[in-house]
Swiss-Prot record:
Its main location: membrane. Belongs to the TRAFAC class TrmE-Era-EngA-EngB-Septin-like GTPase superfamily. AIG1/Toc34/Toc159-like paraseptin GTPase family. IAN subfamily. This is GTPase IMAP family member 5. Residues 1-284 are cytoplasmic. Widely expressed with high levels in lymph node and spleen. High expression found in T lymphocytes, including CD4 and CD8-positive T-cells, and monocytes. Very low expression levels in B-lymphocytes. It is found in: Lysosome membrane; Endosome, Multivesicular body membrane; Endosome membrane. Residues 25-228 form the AIG1-type G domain. One of its GO terms (cellular component) is lysosomal membrane. GTP binds at residues 34-42, 55, 152-154, 189. It is a single-pass type IV membrane protein. GO terms for molecular function: GTP binding. It comes from Homo sapiens. InterPro entries: G_AIG1 (IPR006703), GIMA/IAN/Toc (IPR045058), P-loop_NTPase (IPR027417). The gene is GIMAP5.
Amino acid sequence: MGGFQRGKYGTMAEGRSEDNLSATPPALRIILVGKTGCGKSATGNSILGQPVFESKLRAQSVTRTCQVKTGTWNGRKVLVVDTPSIFESQADTQELYKNIGDCYLLSAPGPHVLLLVIQLGRFTAQDTVAIRKVKEVFGTGAMRHVVILFTHKEDLGGQALDDYVANTDNCSLKDLVRECERRYCAFNNWGSVEEQRQQQAELLAVIERLGREREGSFHSNDLFLDAQLLQRTGAGACQEDYRQYQAKVEWQVEKHKQELRENESNWAYKALLRVKHLMLLHYEIFVFLLLCSILFFIIFLFIFHYI
């Protein structure tokens, strides 16, 4: 495997649109998502093979703003976006929307992979909230591009990751793995150089499988197109352009929230219909058995009477 090589630091103004006519393959765009303290920044460093993101063992987020760093893998540019606390259960603020807008700008025209970082053995209610926030920020369709990355791989000991996932008693984690179509891998972010190279290869194998399944497409929506347009404007963009863009960010997130609520309502309605159908089916079976019992009892009395 060709390892990652350190590339230049990216900025919001450096994003380029995809060019399918170019001989150079488009950059592989990865957004790191997950709850605060799960190891997103350290994972980004492991992917790029360099300590380009600030990473410390803290309960609170070290990353305050969205950041993008780049590298190459087998000649292909890799772009990794690290995110601050935008996937937490918190009130919607202008700072939150600004960070979401920056995330879109840095990853336009859209990510090939949303890398959901989860600490091995610590899948909690906060992780469940983070997953819902991912859907609110990027839309429910974003889950088609989610890859789960478990940190603290060293805690597996000699156990295979597949066995850990198959044998977990955490129903929420099982549902997540099923929703992500079993796309997952694990990292020891403090492993040796050789171990990290092997982890890079395992992750990229999962990403390549996802690419084949999605025919090379990436996740996008109207806001990513707006972000790409603002990128092209570059230095020519004025304050009014940014103000309008931020208003679109708020509108898009609210739209995603509404779609999520509607999907949940539809799911609940369909579940209720299934329950009613089962109750009706069981009721018919109960009536049939009751009539059979009565008929059997009458026959028994008739036979008993004439014996």
